Amino acid sequence: MKHLLTLMEFAPHEVEYLLRVSREFKTRFLAGEIYTPLFPGRVLILYFEKHSTRTRLSLTSAAAQLGIQAVYTTPNELQIARGETVADTMRVISRYAAAVAARVYKHETLEEMARHSAIPVINALSDKHHPLQALADALTLWERAGRLHNVKIAFVGDVSNNVATSLAIIGAKLGWEVRLVGPKQLWNQRLVDELAEDAAKTGARIYFTDSINEVAGVDGVYTDVWVSMGFEKEAEERRRLLKPYQVNQRVMEIAGKKAVFLHCLPAHRGEEVTDDVIDGPQSAVWDQAENRMHTAKAVLAYLLK
């Protein structure tokens, strides 16, 4: 059974295939083409422990375009809130649906779901990984930079979070140079070590740096919120630590005119990014958000084929 828990388990050619299918789906969508639903009568369960805008709506829209009915639920609506096990819950869901997309606090919950599932489990965000976001990031950079490989991207800010991790993974699969720009306290050198094998095969370069000047010459500058869901107690400390890594006009000037600005959203305007950047001519965040839908279609089609 093939799941999408992280992109680590996907070979470089599989990642590239997903992106090419995503681009084809987008081309057909923008042309207004109405095509025969690929999976009529199938059901996708959206099991979400956390709030969501883009992930929930992109998956729901993607499913509808493929002929799949998306059913949204939360733990509080299920017997799991009263003590039913994850294992038993997944055994039941497997009888009703063709796939389940889960947005969870702990990545271990996803792993347990997959162990007891007879259907594909899709990571719709966990504390460690956000593979659906990374696929949309890659599609956006491909569109803007004009190439799928040999892309240079700088992730600025909380380089330890799930979005940065998944960006590094997909970069290793596609032969990118991924510069993780942030304070040394947040570096995860083990991630670089884990990606070394893929990087050696694809020619990728993944590294950490605390110098904001490392954004120079990149194809994209990427940031995310400084206080992710679940880290509210550390809010003030994180803001103090990450303040030097705000993406503002000065940072974009260092990056250069060809660099696009990326953000997975929602943005805390005035914190990790200034209004003039996210609303400026180099911003690609709305294309990036749209691409969540097209890459979700590719993932669903690949896992359900």
Swiss-Prot record:
EC number(s) given by UniProt: 2.1.3.3
Gene Ontology MF annotations: amino acid binding; ornithine carbamoyltransferase activity
Pathway recorded for this protein: Amino-acid biosynthesis; L-arginine biosynthesis; L-arginine from L-ornithine and carbamoyl phosphate: step 1/3
Example of a GO biological process term: L-arginine biosynthetic process
GO cellular component: cytoplasm
Residues engaged in binding L-ornithine: N162, D224, S228, M229
Cellular compartment(s): Cytoplasm
Function: Reversibly catalyzes the transfer of the carbamoyl group from carbamoyl phosphate (CP) to the N(epsilon) atom of ornithine (ORN) to produce L-citrulline.
Family: Belongs to the aspartate/ornithine carbamoyltransferase superfamily. OTCase family.
Name of the protein described by the UniProt record: Ornithine carbamoyltransferase
Organism (species): Pyrobaculum aerophilum (strain ATCC 51768 / DSM 7523 / JCM 9630 / CIP 104966 / NBRC 100827 / IM2)
Gene name tied to this protein: argF
